[in-house]
Amino acid sequence: MRYQVKFREDALKEWQKLDKAIQQQFAKKLKKCCDNPHIPSAKLRGIKDCYKIKLRASGFRLVYQVIDEQLIIAVVAVGKRERSDVYNLASERMR
């Protein structure tokens, strides 16, 4: 079963502001997640059904929610890890 990637409207705006090289790196990792989105080491505590993708070199993070019933990976937030901003933003959006 292959999952489909969808963006929340606000996450899409964040995505479009990213440098093309960073978008490509995230796209490559998201493509891998389409086959197996439930990666135990990437699971976020405190936010239900959410996982992260890390780009260590640039410090960017992408937070996505897995919706198994519809086979969807919903991108919740994209941003820098600094001060856990992207995780706090994702947590707010999931409420």
From Swiss-Prot:
Question: Signal peptide: which range, if any?
Answer: none
Asked if the Swiss-Prot or TrEMBL record annotates the protein with the keyword Ribosomal protein, the reply is no
Coiled coil residues, start to end: none
**Which keywords describe this protein according to UniProt?**
Plasmid, Toxin-antitoxin system
One Pfam family, short name: ParE_toxin
Q: What does this protein do?
A: Toxic component of a type II toxin-antitoxin (TA) system.
Q: Which family does it belong to?
A: Belongs to the RelE toxin family.
Record's protein name: Putative RelE-like toxin protein
